[in-house]
Amino acid sequence: MPDPNRFHFDEGSTPLLPGYEDRTVNSFVPADPQREPNLSIARDRFAGAETLSDYVARQVLLLKKKLPGYKASAPAPVALGGTLGGLAVEASYRSGATSVHQRQAVFAVSDERALVFTMSSPRAFDAAADALWRAWLAGFRPADEA
C-alpha cells in the first residue's frame, strides 16, 4: 500500500509536506487538439459535509460566474469503472472567439474527496467523442486493483 504521506507518480514520489494536500490534475492531450478532445482528471475536496450533488451545484455556480456564456445541463447519473456512481454535466462556454464544449463527471472517492473527469473540445461532441468518453470512464480501475 502506498505511503499516504508521499505523492506517487510514474517517475517516482515526493513527500507530501505538512499543510499541503494532493490537488493534482492529470492532462491528456491528443495529437490534434482541434479535432480530438482534451481529457483531464482532477482531484478535489468537498466543502464541509457537502454531498456529491451539492458539490456539482456549487461548481456549476462558480463556472457560471467565471466563464462567459456558460450553460450546463442538469446533472445525470454516470458510472466510473462500471461500479462507482457519480454525476455528469454537459456544458459549453466562450473562451474569446472560441466555443468550448465540455463534459465533466464527478465521483466521490471518500467522504471528503472527489475525482473530476473532464473532456473538452472546441468542436461539438460527436459519436466518436461519446464512445471515447464511455470507454475512458469504463476503463477506470481503483489503485488497489490497477
Label for each model-derived stretch:
Residues M1-G86, Y93-R103, V109-A146:
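N-terminal targeting sequences that direct proteins away from the cytosol to non-cytosolic compartments
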